[in-house]
Structure formats: structure tokens, C-alpha cells
């Protein structure tokens, strides 16, 4: 059977509420005003270092390396304490994963979220055992949209045909750069209109995913 690689945030899980809470807890420690959920959701997609850079820039800061590292460490302290307190698996996502797994698909994760937090999220939701490989944002020097992490995840599956499933501009660009067919989840953290993102198929509910992936193999 072929392989499939999934993004995490905005694709399998709605994690923005926990990311939002951790950012605001980190800011509260220095007496700063909180951000709205919509603002933080708009900062998600390129990994924690870029998230923190965007948070600080939105506050009018141009941080040096020390300030950025300090804020990132504070954020991660709060986030890793419980990354699933407010996070939820998208409806139908677990069932789709289990269906694909039962059919013999090999499944990997490629995310810009750090490896440990990604693994903890999958474990907390009882789906870690469905994944054959995880490539997190701190596993390689490169992060998406550089194709290296996706290529590493695909290579770990050792299948001739590998598809990629994601929700954002970053995911679409990564798939295109890696030369993989891309299935776009339309209900995640995308900013641009669907037609602006290169994709080979799209879905709005994970119930549709197994049939879509089979169609992309045809």
C-alpha cells in the first residue's frame, strides 16, 4: 500500500486554543496585554520560532536573539505543560486514520511543531500507534516550506507513492517543492482562498479523506 504524510496543526487537530493560551500566559508573566485567538491563529504555521517572532513584532518589538529565546522558552514551558488541554481532534480525523491504517497504509507526520510536543499530542489522543514516523520542526535544520522535512517523512515510509495532507499555504508550498500530490483540508488555518493554493484534491471533513486519497492514487 502507499504512504501518506499528515500535517498536524489545522489538519488533524485544532490546536490554536492551546497555543493561544500559552502565548498569553507567557505575556502575562511580563505584564503584557493578551492577544485574541484570531490573532494567534493567524501566526500559526511556520513553527515556534516564527510564531514568537510574529508575536513580538505585533507588539512593536524587534527582538535580539536573547529576547527571542527568552520568550520562546517561556512559551514552550506553558505549552508543553499540557498541549491538549484545549485542543481537539477534528471530527472524523481519528476514524479516517484508523481506516487507512486498517487498509495497510503507512502513515507519517510532518509538522513544524517540535517533536516532543507533537508526539505528546498524538499520545494524549490515543493515535500515536497509527504513525510509522514523526518529523517535527526541530528534527532537521530546515522547516516547512523547505521540502527537506516532508522528504524525510516520506522516505521513512519506504513506499514508492506517498501523498501529503495539510491545511495551509505552507503545506501546499512544501508539497509542491517536494513533488508530492497534495490533499488540502479546507477547514484549517489557511489564509488565502482555496483556489490560490496548489492542490490535487480537497476535503472539508475527514470522512471524505480515505476516498479522496484513493482517488489521488488512480
Swiss-Prot record:
Molecular function as annotated in GO: metal ion binding; phosphoglycolate phosphatase activity
Keyword Hydrolase: yes
GO BP terms in the entry: DNA repair; glycolate biosynthetic process; reductive pentose-phosphate cycle
Catalytic activity of the protein: 2-phosphoglycolate + H2O = glycolate + phosphate
Highest taxon, organism lineage: Bacteria
Catalytic residues (UniProt): 7
Annotated SUPFAM superfamilies: HAD-like
Binding of Mg(2+), residues: 7, 9, 167
Pathway(s) annotated for this protein in UniProt: Organic acid metabolism; glycolate biosynthesis; glycolate from 2-phosphoglycolate: step 1/1
Keyword field: Calvin cycle, Carbohydrate metabolism, Hydrolase, Magnesium, Metal-binding, Photosynthesis
Cellular compartments per GO CC: cytosol
CDD domains, alphabetized: HAD_PGPase
The keyword Kinase appears for this protein: no
EC number per UniProt: 3.1.3.18
Protein family (similarity comment): Belongs to the HAD-like hydrolase superfamily. CbbY/CbbZ/Gph/YieH family.
Task performed by this protein: Specifically catalyzes the dephosphorylation of 2-phosphoglycolate. Is involved in the dissimilation of the intracellular 2-phosphoglycolate formed during the DNA repair of 3'-phosphoglycolate ends, a major class of DNA lesions induced by oxidative stress.
HAMAP family from the UniProt entry: GPH_hydrolase_bact (MF_00495)
Full protein name: Phosphoglycolate phosphatase
Source organism of the structure: Cereibacter sphaeroides (strain ATCC 17025 / ATH 2.4.3) (Rhodobacter sphaeroides)
Taxonomic path: Bacteria, Pseudomonadati, Pseudomonadota, Alphaproteobacteria, Rhodobacterales
Amino acid at each position: 500500500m502507499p504512504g501518506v504524510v499528515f500535517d498536524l496543526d489545522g489538519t488533524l487537530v485544532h490546536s490554536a486554543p492551546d497555543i493561544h493560551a500559552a502565548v498569553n500566559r507567557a505575556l502575562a508573566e511580563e505584564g503584557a496585554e493578551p492577544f485574541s485567538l484570531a490573532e494567534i491563529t493567524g501566526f500559526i504555521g511556520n513553527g515556534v520560532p516564527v510564531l514568537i517572532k510574529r508575536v513580538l513584532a505585533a507588539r512593536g518589538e524587534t527582538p535580539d536573539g536573547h529576547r527571542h529565546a527568552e520568550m520562546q522558552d517561556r512559551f514552550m514551558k506553558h505549552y508543553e505543560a499540557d498541549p491538549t488541554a484545549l485542543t481537539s481532534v477534528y471530527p472524523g480525523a481519528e476514524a479516517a486514520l484508523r481506516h487507512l491504517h486498517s487498509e495497510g497504509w503507512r502513515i507519517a507526520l510532518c509538522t513544524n511543531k517540535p517533536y516532543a510536543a507533537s508526539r505528546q499530542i498524538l499520545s494524549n489522543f490515543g493515535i500515536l500507534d497509527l504513525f510509522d514516523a514523526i518529523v517535527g520542526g526541530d528534527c532537521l535544520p530546515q522547516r516547512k516550506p523547505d521540502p527537506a522535512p516532508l522528504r524525510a517523512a516520506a522516505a521513512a515510509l519506504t513506499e514508492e507513492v506517498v501523498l501529503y495532507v495539510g491545511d495551509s499555504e505552507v503545506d501546499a508550498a512544501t508539497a509542491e517543492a517536494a513533488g508530492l500530490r497534495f490533499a488540502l483540508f479546507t477547514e484549517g488555518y489557511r489564509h488565502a482562498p482555496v483556489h490560490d493554493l496548489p492542490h490535487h484534491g480537497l476535503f472539508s471533513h475527514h470522512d471524505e479523506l480515505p476516498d479522496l486519497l484513493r482517488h489521488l492514487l488512480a
